[in-house]
From Swiss-Prot:
PROSITE patterns: RECA_1 (PS00321), RECA_2 (PS50162), RECA_3 (PS50163). This is Protein RecA. It holds the Pfam family RecA. Keywords: ATP-binding, Cytoplasm, DNA damage, DNA recombination, DNA repair, DNA-binding, Nucleotide-binding, SOS response. The keyword Signal does not apply. The keyword Cell division does not apply. It comes from Cereibacter sphaeroides (strain ATCC 17029 / ATH 2.4.9) (Rhodobacter sphaeroides). It is found in: Cytoplasm. Belongs to the RecA family. Can catalyze the hydrolysis of ATP in the presence of single-stranded DNA, the ATP-dependent uptake of single-stranded DNA by duplex DNA, and the ATP-dependent hybridization of homologous single-stranded DNAs. It interacts with LexA causing its activation and leading to its autocatalytic cleavage. One of its GO terms (biological process) is DNA repair. GO terms for cellular component: cytosol. Its main location: cytoplasm. GO terms for molecular function: ATP binding; ATP hydrolysis activity; ATP-dependent DNA damage sensor activity; damaged DNA binding; single-stranded DNA binding.
Length: 357
C-alpha cells in the first residue's frame, strides 16, 4: 500500500513538472514570439549545415562539409602574401555562382578589381565598402547582416579596423586594447543576427609577434581573443614554396591548416598551388588528390587515368586536364565520391552536405 502511494505521489510530481514546463514555454512564446524556444527534434529533423565551396577541392574535403559553413563567423589568417584575399575571393565567386549576394568591406583599401575578376568574381554584383573607421566598418557589416538579403560578407582585414579614437588622436598616443574592445562588442552584436540570417561573415586577419616568448609559438592574431572564440572555423594559410617555369616564378605552393572547426573534425591540412593571375590551380589539385584517392595512377613520372595516359610529369598532366575538361570533371566526381561528400547542388542552392565520413 505504501509503495502504491509513493508511486502515485511520484506520478503526480512528474505531471506537475510537465505542466510547469508547458506553462513556462507558453509564457516565453507569448513574451518573445513563437519559435523562440522549442525542442530540438520537434516537428522537423535537425537541418543540415549549408556550405559554400572554397574553390579548392582539397580544402572543401578537409573542412568536412564540402566548404565553409553558412550562418557562421570564419577567420582566415596568415603572413603577408600567403593567399588570404585570394582564398576569400574564390569563396565570393563560388557564392555568386549559386546566386548569392556578396559584400566586401575593404578596410585595407587594397582590393584589386581586375584580379578579383580573373578569379571569377562578378564585379557588377559585388557590393564594396571602404570605411574610414573600424566602427563604421562593423556598423556596415551589422546593417547588411540584419537585412537578411546578403549571403556572404568579407572583412579585409581585422588589423585595419582602426578605432575612431585612435584616428582622431595624435600619432604615438597609446590606445590600450581599444581594437580588442571594439571587436569584442562587434562579436556580441553580430553572432545572433548572423545565425538568424544564415549569412557567412569572413574576417581576414594578420599575424603579429608576442614580445618575450621563449617557449611555444610567439605568433598571435590582431584584435584580441573575441574572434577566436566566436569563429566556427579558423584557417591558417601559409606560403610554403615557389612554382617556377625555368627561371620565372609563376606561383606559390600553399598550405592551409584547419586550426578550429565546430562543424567537423579540426586540424586537417591541405596543400594546393596558387598561380599568379589565375588563383587556386584546380587541375593541380585533381592530379594530387586523384593519386591519393587511387583515381589517377602514377607510374614513375607518368600519370594515367583508366587506360589513357594523361601526361609525363605533373605540369604536363595539369595541361592535359585543362585541355580536356570532361576528363577533369570525371576525375573530380570520383574524388568527391571517394571522400563520401555529396557536392551536388540542387535547385534550392543547398548542397555540400556531409553524407558519410
Amino acid at each position: 500500500m505504501a509503495t502504491a502511494n509513493l508511486l502515485d505521489l511520484n506520478g503526480r510530481r512528474e505531471m506537475d513538472k510537465a505542466k510547469a514546463l508547458e506553462s513556462a514555454l507558453a509564457q516565453i512564446e507569448r513574451q518573445f514570439g513563437k519559435g523562440s524556444i522549442m525542442k530540438l527534434g520537434a516537428n522537423s529533423p535537425v537541418m543540415e549545415i549549408e556550405a559554400t565551396s572554397t574553390g579548392s577541392l582539397g580544402l572543401d574535403i578537409a573542412l568536412g562539409i564540402g566548404g565553409l559553413p553558412k550562418g557562421r563567423i570564419i577567420e582566415i589568417y596568415g603572413p603577408e602574401s600567403s593567399g588570404k584575399t585570394t582564398l576569400t575571393l574564390h569563396v565570393v565567386a563560388e557564392e555568386q555562382k549559386k546566386g548569392g549576394v556578396c559584400a566586401f568591406v575593404d578596410a585595407e583599401h587594397a582590393l584589386d578589381p581586375q584580379y578579383a575578376k580573373k578569379l571569377g568574381v562578378n564585379l557588377d554584383e559585388l557590393l564594396i565598402s571602404q570605411p574610414d573607421t573600424g566602427e563604421q566598418a562593423l556598423e556596415i557589416v551589422d546593417t547588411l547582416v540584419r537585412s537578411g538579403a546578403v549571403n556572404l560578407i568579407v572583412v579585409d582585414s581585422v588589423a585595419a579596423l582602426t578605432p575612431k579614437s585612435e584616428i582622431e588622436g595624435d600619432m604615438g598616443d597609446m590606445q590600450m586594447g581599444s581594437q580588442a574592445r571594439l571587436m569584442s562588442q562587434a562579436m556580441r552584436k553580430l553572432t545572433a543576427s548572423i545565425g538568424r540570417s544564415n549569412c557567412m561573415v569572413i574576417f581576414i586577419n594578420q599575424i603579429r609577434m608576442k614580445i618575450g616568448v621563449m617557449f611555444g609559438n610567439p605568433e598571435t592574431t590582431t584584435g584580441g581573443n573575441a574572434l577566436k572564440f566566436y569563429a566556427s572555423v579558423r584557417l591558417d594559410i601559409r606560403r610554403t614554396g615557389a612554382i617556377k617555369d625555368r627561371d620565372n616564378v609563376i606561383g606559390n605552393t600553399t598550405k592551409v591548416k584547419v586550426v578550429k572547426n565546430k562543424v567537423a573534425p579540426p586540424f586537417r591540412e591541405v596543400e594546393f598551388d596558387i598561380m599568379y593571375g589565375e588563383g587556386i590551380s584546380k587541375t593541380g589539385e585533381l592530379v594530387d588528390l586523384g593519386v591519393k584517392a587511387g583515381v589517377v595512377e602514377k607510374s614513375g613520372s607518368w600519370y594515367s587515368y583508366g587506360d589513357e595516359r594523361i601526361g609525363q610529369g605533373r605540369e604536363n598532366a595539369k595541361a592535359f586536364l585543362r585541355a580536356n575538361p570532361t576528363v577533369a570533371g570525371d576525375i573530380e566526381d570520383r574524388i568527391r565520391a571517394s571522400h563520401g561528400l555529396d557536392f551536388s547542388t540542387g535547385e534550392d542552392g543547398k548542397g555540400d552536405d556531409l553524407v558519410d565520413m
